[in-house]
Amino acid sequence: MFIRHTFLVPALFALLAAMPAHAEAPKPASTPAAATASDKPYGEWKKTLKETEKLAGFFNVYRKRENLYVEIKPAQLKMPFLSIVSCARGIGQNGLLGGLPIDDRTLQFERVGDHVLLVQVNERFTTPKGTPIDAARDLSIGNSVLASLKIESEQDSTHALLVDLAPVLVSDITDLGEAMHAALGKSVRLDNSRSALGKAKNFPDNTELEALLTWTPSDRTGLDVSAVPDERFIPITVHYSFSKLPEVPMAPRYADDRVGYFLSAQKDFSRDEKDSFFMRYIHRWRLEKRDPSAAMSEPVKPIVYYVDKTVPEKFRPWVKEAIEKWQVAFEGAGFKNAIIAKDAPGDSTFDPEDVRYSTIRWITSSEPVFGAIGPSRIDPRTGEILDADILFEASMFQSYRNLYRRITTAQELEEGALPQLKIQRDWAHASERNAAGMTARCDLATAASDAGALLGMTLKMDGTLPPGSPVPDEYLHPAVVWAVMHEVGHTLGLRHNFRSSTSTPAPKLQDVAWTTEHGLYSSVMEYPTPNISYDRAKQGQYWTSGAGTYDKWAIRFGYAPSGAAAADQDVAFATRIADESLQPGHEYSTDEDTYPADAPDPRSNIFDLGDDPLGYAKGRTDYLAKLWRDDRFESRVVGDTGDLTALKRAMDTLVLQYGQAAGMAVKYLGGSYISRVHKGQPGEVDPVVPVAAARQREALDFLSQKVWAADAFNASPKLLQRLSPEHWSHWGTPNPFGVRADYALHDRALVLQAAMLRASLAPALLTRMREAESRSADSYRVAEHFDRLTKALWGEVGGLPTALKPLEGTSTRREIQRVYVDQLANMITSPMPGTPDDARGLARLQLQRIDGRCARTLLVPTLGDNTRAHLLEARARVKRALEAGSQVETAPLR
């Protein structure tokens, strides 16, 4: 929080001016020799705590009905501690799920007179204590006061203070109401009359408190909270965890942008001789060698994960196997037995809420939005990971084994095929406060369920798996191991690596010996797709089998001891490891390199495999279309008896994944290869290299043939008549009213076609093309791009009459042509911010050319009614756009 003291000066002078000119100085108050009990400003300690239940621990807590007294010892005043707030029990839908984090801060208690302030410590800025720059910081930057608590009692002998924390806990101090507004689409109000304190637990290093909050929506029209018995009263249990910070901070390791770690950042204004005031520390566990002189040593304290009793028996050995598969990476950092998996003790000595234990647990939700989540407790001063508790959604693996996608809305299909659209929308609504949470989001459920659905279909089409059967354990086991390794990787500090799939040469994908050594992808932090061989006689590993080349390198960067006595020496040590970033298998990119609309690198994707994403897109789309066009599709997926709605969901799964694969081609258009490279490192390359013009043309040709062509999504009429809708009508199922009974393949195809067309005309993409024109004579130019798009979408119009057959026979082609005309028209009349001026001119030119094509074709006397009506309508749209564009451009200045 910034406190701008310059704003206080006028108010101070105004106050002084209002004082009497000859005001007398106040006389000192007399001090009595001894205060009687009745003179004490606070209640007596024993009397205040009468009938309370004491829970001894980090902060001693005393519980009495609606009061929750916290004892603050003198040493605990101005002692920073971690506060992590999470949703202990949600409603199982709308993203309001148990286990999800809400807020984390560093807090401290400060006494001011008869009150104790609950203060959020500003950890963003730091300076060496006692220096002039430290004094300057104190004048400019302060802390935030979250609450002022009346002192209820003070112990005579220890001077410990009692405050009632209940009013803080049973409140909206974390701004949860705003988050619920975003989740539900309705504003909500905390109903204090229906809210209360929940359970409380205490441990030596942490205090755990809960509040049972009830929220009342302002308007229930259209509100969907079917998992709540009474939608007027929405219950959310909020969990507060206060924990101790290490007395001796860990020596931090500075981050390097070439290796993917979560980090904590602080500004140190004393670093005026450095290139930045920022200090960035990676998140890592405190691993110290028991024998510092040994090349390989056991740690003083290993990283231990306890597998909780909530994990089903069958999964426990797989979970422990996955945890300990990280050991090979730590061996590369000089540690043996650095990471250990244990079954959670079954006695009262163990509690997963005790910060001394890191756990893996299973949870269940009515409508899960994540497959797993791995929140960690971080010391913001150093980046030290103090504790981690991984939650797996039980239905994720059920989805992997049994379920296909159910697509109910155009937005769901569009964002499923082009995930960056959803991420962009979420980022747009993310405040600065929760932006860090956006970089840490993990959509593991989507990766796992879609992968399982496709693998199951493949095995059924092979005849390996009987129709209607779930994916068997021999295929589920490696998927579970990957998923657990992925989530454990997050709690070791690692971010996603969406470049790792391109580290494997495509010809090596089915080479089991190669993929066992290097990984099917170089990092388990990837979102992979099953490695399905299109030559079914030569099938390799479906899933990677352990830590990959990147994982081993990243762990070495983060955890290998440097033995350095000074921070600069440790930086030099870590930099030498990071300098290996251009070696094969060390490629790295993460969420912000992959999801944004202006993310330019076609190699940074999710759900791809191999070093040629465009080649992958070609092969995967051919394979998916082959599946739904196979005459055996129904019999192999459903069998002779069974639920035909499963066939519809299977078709939805294939169409969605077709869109995911095809969408990778869009990134080649106006794309650039981005390398995280530092000056002078071995093998140094240019950090930004435009994609070759020939490759961009190849990508557009692919989109033209496999997305925008009239027959791109063709399926047999017989199959479409067999795709049965669901006929259930109760809570937890889609509302059947207003839902089409037939399978709208046309609409689904148009959603994907239009999304990729819009992405191909995005301002950032066109701007990059324009910039590339000045860098190379052999560039893919904006003018060529528009011309090729027009030919791809309107090529049959204006030519030979025999080419018009697709236009007359199906509305799909006519619809995407209208979308293209509308996109060009919008570029003239209401261009998106950032659209290059050249693009507006070229849009006008292409509209004129489309008008000419339509005019020539309308002279053909044998045109069908559909085609003639379509061309006349297109000309009318073009005319309106050109006239409106002229009016906009010639409008006088005001």
Q: Whereabouts are the PLM-identified features?
A:
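Auxiliary tRNA-acceptor-end handling modules of aminoacyl-tRNA synthetases
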Residues: E24-L68, K73-V311, A329, A333, ...
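Bacterial N-terminal signal peptides that target proteins for export
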Residues: M1-V9
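The catalytic-center signature of Zn2+-dependent metalloproteases
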Residues: D343-T364, V369, P478-Y534
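Stable alpha-helical elements in mature extracytoplasmic
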Residues: F315-A322, L476, V480, V484, ...
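Bacterial N-terminal signal peptides
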Residues: V9-A18
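Sec-exported extracytoplasmic/periplasmic mature domains
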Residues: E324-F335, S365, H490, L494, ...
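Conserved catalytic/binding loops enriched for acidic/polar residues
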Residues: P470-Y475, S500-R894
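Sec/Tat signal peptide C-region and signal peptidase I cleavage site
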Residues: M19-A23
